[in-house]
Amino acid sequence: STMSSIYYASAYSEIWGNPDLKPMSEYDINLMWQLNRKYTFTAFAMLEPDYFVQMAYQPADRMAVIMKETNFDYSNCFGLQASAQFRLGSWLNGNVNATALYRHDKTQFFDLPIDRTRLSGIVSGMAVVKFSQRHNIQLILNPFFQTKAIQGLYDIDPFLRLNATLRYTSKDGKWSLVAKGENILNGHISTSSTIARQDYTMRVWMPYTNYSLTAVYRIGNFKEKQKKEVDTSRMGY
């Protein structure tokens, strides 16, 4: 909020507005090289002057947590990413992405000067296992792992997420049975702030573990529209 107001969420938690909050800017630079149509290498930079985010602050003179959106001087990320496709016979194929990310956050938050850097790693991908060509049964795995990272005051613990899909399609292509599991390892993002006088921890569950079973019958010559997958390997969740 850009209002100069204070909302008391509880006896302990306060949400402060910030009338001095400014719009942020973002500049992206990418340099990509592809080898043999199987391997892709990318160097990138994300420069964000006046980046803003809501952070928590614990004052020294009273028991309270103040949540306030604040502008950084900048939040800059520089990284290298390598992507590869793989295939093992007719029963296994997929891709893997590995990213090395260097982040530098700088700002002044209340009486806390923040000038922090961190080198993090992200590994993600997709694996398709075909159990039976005759019966068209396949398992799709989508893992995501991020090492320790930072955001302003916060330290972000390593995070592992795994989604899985088991799909059966009839020989004529009309029937499909799809079983899905999202976040089946019940992963969560844990953040903590322990610099200076701060001692604050928060867990973010995104999303909760859930399972679904779907039966699909295609009428006539209907074909499912192919959707282009969004590259989320640098998003951090």
Can you say where each PLM-predicted feature lies in the sequence?
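Residue-level signature of outer-membrane beta-barrel architecture
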Residues: 31-35, 45, 84-90, 100, ...
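Outer-membrane beta-barrel proteins
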Residues: 1-2, 17-21, 29, 48-56, 66-72, 84, 93, 103-109, ...
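Surface-exposed extracellular loop regions of Gram-negative outer-membrane beta-barrel proteins
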Residues: 1-28, 43-63, 182-198
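Outer membrane beta-barrel strand-and-loop segments of large Gram-negative receptors
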Residues: 22, 28, 41-97, 106-122
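Membrane-spanning beta-strand positions in outer-membrane beta-barrel proteins
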Residues: 30, 34, 38-42, 93, ...
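Transmembrane beta-barrel strands of outer-membrane/channel proteins
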Residues: 27, 33, 41-47, 96-102, ...
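Conserved C-terminal beta-signal and adjacent last beta-strands/turns
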Residues: 117-237
